[in-house]
Amino acid sequence: SPALSARVTRTVNTLAVLPTSSWFRPLSADASKMDGLNVHFAAVDEVHEHTGPEIIQKLNTATGARRQPLIFEITTAGHDRHSVCRQHHEFSVKALEGALPHETADPWFAFIATIDEGDDWTDPAVWAKANPSLGVTVKIDDLKRQIDEAREMPAQQNAIRRLRLNEWTE
C-alpha cells in the first residue's frame, strides 16, 4: 500500500522502519549465529523440519526485553516424535484440552488443522478438517489426485498423510 511504502524502507532481504530501528528479515538457520537478538516478533516456518530445538530456544530467550513479544510457528505434522515440533504439538493439544494451568496455557495460542484419529484419510468428507482453505488455495482436484496415487502407491502414503492431512507419521 502507498501508506505502508512511505514508512517502510525495502532492501533485498530486509523491511525496515528507520525512525524506530525496527526491521523484519530472514534469519540464519544456524542457531549459533542468533545470539544477541532482541526479538519482538518472529515467524518460524516448517517447524517439523528443524533438526533440534536451538533456533526456537534462541528466539524465545531473545524476547526477554519485550513486553508483548510474539513468536508465530507454522508447520505441518512431522515424523520425529522426539522433535521440538512434536513437543510443541503435544503442548498445544494439552493447552486446547484445558489440561494445563491457565497461566501456562493462556500465552500459548494453538490452531491444529488435522483429520481426526480414526478418520478414513481417503474420504473426501474429512479433507477440509486438515485443509481449511480447501477449494481456495488447496485445489480439491489436486488433493484427490495425490490421495488416489497414494492409495495405489503405499510408499507415498506417509508423505501425503503428513503433508496434506497433517497426521503424524512414523
Predicted segments — roles?
Residues S32-K33, H50, D80:
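Glycine-rich nucleotide phosphate-binding loop and flanking beta-alpha elements
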